[in-house]
Each structure stands twice: as C-alpha cells, then as structure tokens.
UniProtKB/Swiss-Prot annotation:
The basic functional RuBisCO is composed of a large chain homodimer in a 'head-to-tail' conformation. In form I RuBisCO this homodimer is arranged in a barrel-like tetramer with the small subunits forming a tetrameric 'cap' on each end of the 'barrel'. This protein is expected to contain an N-terminal transit peptide but none has been predicted. Keywords: Calvin cycle, Carbon dioxide fixation, Chloroplast, Photorespiration, Photosynthesis, Plastid. Heterohexadecamer of 8 large and 8 small subunits. It comes from Spinacia oleracea. One of its GO terms (cellular component) is chloroplast. Gene3D superfamilies: Ribulose bisphosphate carboxylase, small subunit. One of its GO terms (molecular function) is ribulose-bisphosphate carboxylase activity. It is found in: Plastid, Chloroplast. The modification Methionine derivative is found at residue 1. PANTHER family: RIBULOSE BISPHOSPHATE CARBOXYLASE SMALL CHAIN 1, CHLOROPLASTIC (PTHR31262), RIBULOSE BISPHOSPHATE CARBOXYLASE SMALL SUBUNIT 1A, CHLOROPLASTIC-RELATED (PTHR31262:SF10). This is Ribulose bisphosphate carboxylase small subunit, chloroplastic 1. It holds the Pfam family RuBisCO_small. Belongs to the RuBisCO small chain family.
Length: 123
C-alpha cells in the first residue's frame, strides 16, 4: 500500500488523487459528459490553480474560485476529440496555466463535474 506524500503536492478537484489523465482517458471523460448532454466549457488560471485567501485571513467564497473562461462554452458539442483539441490549445497559449474542464447541465443550470485537465510542471 502506498501513502500519498502530504507536502508539496496540492490536491485540486475531482480526479486529483489519480495520476494525470492520458489523452485516451480524457477522451473517455469528455465522451461521458457529452453523452449526458452536458456542455463542456474550459477555464484556465495562470496564477494559482487552487483556492487561496486573497481578501481576508479566513477564506471567502470568491477567493481563487473563479477562473478565466477559454473562448465560449462548446454548446452542441458532440465530438470528444474537438474538446480535447481545445485543451491542447489552452496548454499552448499560457503554457504555465492550469486548465479546468467543467460539465455544465443547462437543464438544471448547475455544474455537474469539474476537474483539472492539465497542470503545469511542478504541481
């Protein structure tokens, strides 16, 4: 049994305790979300990919939670490869950015899943 080292390895969101997703695994996740009918927007964050305290000593709701959206959400997207290609584009634009993938349910108007699709080196 292996224990995860507690120092220097921050955890982020869903799937963060797994090794980085391969392209095939990312395609499978995206396909699952598209089959569910969820909209796949992408977000990126250059400064910090985790919740941090910005305005006070205690964490507030807005501290480090809102990222910049990459282009527009992919409404009507049906091809997982197209979505993964967008992830590759985000990785090139700001190469030191975190890339977050979201599954948004437009019927219930809620975010159903969110996970880090790419972390820069050193995280």
């Amino acid at each position: 049994m292996q224990v995860w080292p507690p120092l220097g390895l921050k955890k982020f969101e869903t799937l963060s305790y797994l090794p980085p997703l391969t392209t095939e695994q990312l395609l499978a996740e995206v396909n699952y979300l598209l089959v569910k009918g969820w909209i796949p927007p992408l977000e990126f964050e250059v400064k910090d990919g985790f919740v941090y305290r910005e305005h006070d000593k205690s964490p507030g709701y807005y501290d480090g939670r809102y990222w910049t959206m990459w282009k527009l959400p992919m409404f009507g997207g049906t091809d997982p490869a197209q979505v993964v290609n967008e992830v590759e584009e985000v990785k090139k634009a700001p190469p030191d950015a975190f890339v977050r993938f979201i599954g948004f349910n437009d019927k219930r108007e809620v975010q159903c899943i969110s996970f880090i699709a790419y972390k820069p080196a050193g995280y």
